């Protein structure tokens, strides 16, 4: 089963360190940002330590790396040309890094229309993606299902479908299905996941889903908040998320946890991924998980 989490990529070890961290959590796949998600400071491809990273991955049976684009990219922005241009240029560079790392998909938040309206935002995203997807490599951009916070685009399957339909080289577009976001956007992920998936299939096609973000939600369905919770401790609940992780439709695609670190003290928070992954492998909820994470 391809199950992993977001892991860090930093220091001198870079990808090697990411692979070691994923192995220590008992993962078979993992997701990285190529640098801090809040800025555009990046190391050169030569400094990402890719060869050693791949050696560690081979040794420990890790595969299907996923890259996540930084949050600062907003190609839906119609009011500031510099924001749009930065997004297009930086996304092209990120795709080059993604290809060098050996990942097939880079996850992208479609963007926010910042008041110009959904139609204008979608048209701008299409314009940006058409600019980005001209070069000849095989990296896909995985558009993420969004919660609908603020002026986010991608809160409905229809919005994502409109983007995909407008892009010329749309064979290089995939979808990252985020359980928390989709729940927060109003879909009944908790009680009728197959119904949600059928709806997605009719509007977009389930074969477009190439990454799943597995997150519980701190808020009730339709809250449009996007606040992740640990597996089984939120409004979606363990049973629904366990069902999704083991779903036949997602058997061969990476399922990535982005759940929050545990702990009240901001200086002493601990990653939950090792124990959450064990729990999902055993298919048994552990109400003591958070306490056990702090005792690690």
From Swiss-Prot:
Reaction catalysed by this enzyme: Endonucleolytic cleavage to 5'-phosphooligonucleotide end-products
Superkingdom: Bacteria
Biological processes, Gene Ontology terms: base-excision repair
Binding-site list for Zn(2+) 2: 144, 178, 213, 258
Signal peptide: none
Residue positions binding Zn(2+) 3: 181, 226, 228
Keyword Zinc attributed: yes
UniProt-listed Enzyme Commission number(s): 3.1.21.2
This protein's record includes keyword Transit peptide: no
InterPro entries associated with the record: AP_endonuc_2 (IPR001719), AP_endonuc_F2_Zn_BS (IPR018246), Xyl_isomerase-like_sf (IPR036237), Xyl_isomerase-like_TIM-brl (IPR013022)
Cofactor dependency: Zn(2+)
Enzyme class, UniProt record, top EC level: hydrolase
Cofactor mode of binding and number, as noted: Binds 3 Zn(2+) ions.
Residues reported to bind Zn(2+) 1: 68, 109, 144
Entry GO MF terms: deoxyribonuclease IV (phage-T4-induced) activity; DNA binding; DNA-(apurinic or apyrimidinic site) endonuclease activity; phosphoric diester hydrolase activity; zinc ion binding
UniProtKB keywords: DNA damage, DNA repair, Endonuclease, Hydrolase, Metal-binding, Nuclease, Zinc
Family: Belongs to the AP endonuclease 2 family.
Role noted for this protein: Endonuclease IV plays a role in DNA repair. It cleaves phosphodiester bonds at apurinic or apyrimidinic (AP) sites, generating a 3'-hydroxyl group and a 5'-terminal sugar phosphate.
Protein's recorded name: Probable endonuclease 4
Gene name in the database record: nfo
């Amino acid at each position: 089963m391809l199950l992993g989490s977001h892991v860090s990529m930093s220091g001198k070890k870079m990808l090697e360190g990411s692979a070691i961290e994923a192995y220590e959590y008992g993962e078979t796949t993992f997701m990285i940002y190529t640098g801090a998600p809040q800025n555009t400071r990046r190391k050169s491809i030569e400094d990402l330590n890719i060869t050693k990273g791949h050696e560690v991955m081979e040794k420990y049976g890790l595969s299907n790396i996923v890259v996540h684009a930084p949050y600062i990219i907003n190609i839906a922005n119609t009011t500031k040309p510099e924001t749009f241009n930065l997004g297009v240029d930086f996304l092209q560079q990120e795709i080059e890094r993604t290809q060098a790392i050996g990942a097939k998909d880079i996850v992208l938040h479609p963007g926010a229309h910042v008041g110009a309206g959904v139609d204008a935002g979608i048209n701008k995203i299409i314009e940006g993606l058409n600019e980005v997807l001209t070069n000849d490599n095989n990296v896909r951009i995985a558009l993420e299902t969004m919660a609908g916070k603020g002026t986010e685009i991608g809160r409905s399957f229809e919005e994502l479908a409109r983007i995909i339909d407008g892009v010329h080289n749309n064979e290089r577009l995939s979808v990252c299905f985020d359980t928390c976001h989709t729940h927060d956007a109003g879909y009944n992920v908790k009680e009728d996941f197959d119904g949600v998936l059928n709806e997605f299939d009719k509007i977009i096609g389930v074969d477009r889903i190439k990454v799943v973000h597995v997150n519980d939600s701190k808020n009730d369905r339709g809250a449009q908040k996007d606040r992740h919770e640990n597996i089984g401790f939120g409004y979606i609940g363990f049973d629904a998320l366990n069902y999704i992780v083991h779903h036949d439709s997602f058997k061969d695609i990476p399922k990535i946890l982005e759940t929050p670190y545990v702990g009240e003290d901001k200086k002493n928070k601990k990653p939950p991924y090792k124990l959450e992954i064990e729990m999902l492998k055993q298919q048994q909820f552990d109400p003591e998980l958070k306490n056990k994470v702090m005792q690690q």
